[in-house]
Amino acid sequence: MAKEKRETIRLFSSSKNGHFYSTTKNKRTSSEKMTLKKFDPFARKHVIYIESKNS
């Protein structure tokens, strides 16, 4: 069976309220941690989300 090219990750909110987004990323082309600015419904504003492995 072939090895998966994409890895499932979670993007956790930097406001530390437990909200996260699930997404995938290519293991080969992007080895550094992903950070995105997205809307946090608990904080009701846009915050930075930081990558963490989905286990």
Swiss-Prot record:
Keywords: Ribonucleoprotein, Ribosomal protein. SUPFAM superfamilies: Zn-binding ribosomal proteins (SSF57829). GO terms for molecular function: structural constituent of ribosome. Transmembrane segments: none annotated. GO terms for biological process: translation. Coiled coil: none annotated. One of its GO terms (cellular component) is cytosolic large ribosomal subunit. Pfam families: Ribosomal_L33 (PF00471). Belongs to the bacterial ribosomal protein bL33 family. This is Large ribosomal subunit protein bL33. The gene is rpmG.
